[in-house]
């Protein structure tokens, strides 16, 4: 029997916690637990029992995600018209939910993205906000399900009265670096892979034929999200123990992180007047850049809203 290590979780000093923050905390703690050669037992400090943040985290499934018998199970909280608790999305769930009237995994993901956006925005009206958020959720889920090799990802999100919205998609898969290694991309290494991943036309499917590329992946999803964030908010991409942050004032940060899988956190602080036009302009610019590098053109799905 392996030795056991009790670890006390003390979050009592945290007064406010957005989805991006608690997702990162959860991944750090989970990776710590998984990488030890002894059994880690998480316990919640007594001083946390009266914390409003702990109440919120227990409600959204944070502790269940860590494997603690505390608070709601993942997927059991109903959420509200301002937030989506931690929810599991799997290929099997999507097929079971939508297969009666949809044909492909991409169709299922589109339906799920629209459903999540309706919850987040309290409306099904196809406003510019609705279109750009649906697009972003769809591309982030596609990235997770098509590249992680686990068939499962987790989503959580929140919106605020000032129009700000934050969307988190995370998985515990192989990570972007290992995924891109399958494409034999020139000059790829474990320091530059995130920079390559946000370039247009870079995908693990680069060396696949059209017949083999069953998901019609062309390597434009992260490229578009990166440029959307540079104009309208903030993007965090963490994968294969590295992270990249970009903000709408064009500031960028890079560094190391413990998580092997992938986290995509996109925050909208403002919205385009014409989402379709913005996406098309970004993709067109990307196609020109990709052509100069001999890479793929975008798929129809990558530029559709």
Predicted regions and their residues:
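Flexible, glycine-/charge-rich segments associated with ATP-binding catalytic modules
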Residues: 1, 67, 184, 188, ...
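N-terminal assembly/transducer modules of large multi-domain enzymes
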Residues: 1-67, 265-305
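Conserved short strand/loop->alpha-helix "switch" segment adjacent to the catalytic nucleotide/phosphoryl-transfer site
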Residues: 16, 20, 114-138
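Conserved ATP-binding N-box helix of the HATPase_c
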Residues: 28, 60, 127-161, 222-229
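Helix-loop-beta hinge of the Bergerat
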Residues: 84-124, 185-206, 225-227
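Short beta-strand element(s) in the Bergerat
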Residues: 163-167, 262
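Acidic ATP/Mg2+-coordinating residue in the GHKL
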Residues: 171
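Glycine-rich G1-box
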Residues: 174
């Amino acid at each position: 029997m392996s030795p056991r290590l009790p670890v006390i979780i003390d979050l009592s000093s945290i007064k406010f916690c957005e989805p991006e923050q608690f997702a990162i905390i959860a991944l750090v703690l989970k990776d710590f637990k998984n990488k030890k050669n002894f059994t880690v037992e998480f316990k919640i400090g007594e001083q946390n029992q009266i914390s409003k943040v702990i109440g919120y985290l227990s409600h959204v499934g944070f502790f269940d995600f860590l494997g603690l018998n505390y608070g709601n199970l993942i997927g059991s909280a109903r959420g509200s018209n301002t937030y989506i608790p931690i929810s599991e999305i799997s290929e099997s769930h999507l097929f079971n939910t939508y297969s009666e009237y949809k044909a492909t995994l991409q169709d299922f993901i589109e339906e799920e993205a629209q459903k999540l956006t309706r919850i987040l925005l309290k409306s099904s009206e196809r406003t510019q906000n609705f279109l750009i958020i649906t697009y972003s959720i769809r591309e982030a889920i596609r990235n997770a399900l098509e590249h992680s090799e686990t068939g499962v990802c987790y989503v959580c999100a929140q919106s605020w009265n000032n129009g700000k919205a934050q969307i988190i998609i995370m998985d515990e898969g192989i990570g972007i670096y290992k995924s891109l290694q399958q494409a034999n991309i020139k000059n790829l290494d474990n320091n530059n892979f995130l920079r390559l991943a946000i370039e247009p036309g870079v995908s693990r499917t680069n060396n696949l034929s059209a017949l083999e590329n069953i998901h019609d992946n062309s390597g434009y999803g992260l490229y578009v999200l990166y440029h959307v964030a540079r104009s309208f908010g903030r993007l965090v991409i963490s994968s294969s123990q590295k992270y990249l942050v970009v903000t709408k004032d064009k500031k960028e940060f890079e560094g190391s992180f413990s998580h092997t899988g992938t986290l995509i956190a996109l925050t909208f602080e403002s919205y385009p007047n014409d989402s379709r036009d913005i996406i098309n302009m970004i993709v067109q610019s990307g196609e020109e850049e990709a052509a100069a590098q001999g890479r793929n053109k975008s798929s129809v799905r990558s530029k559709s809203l």
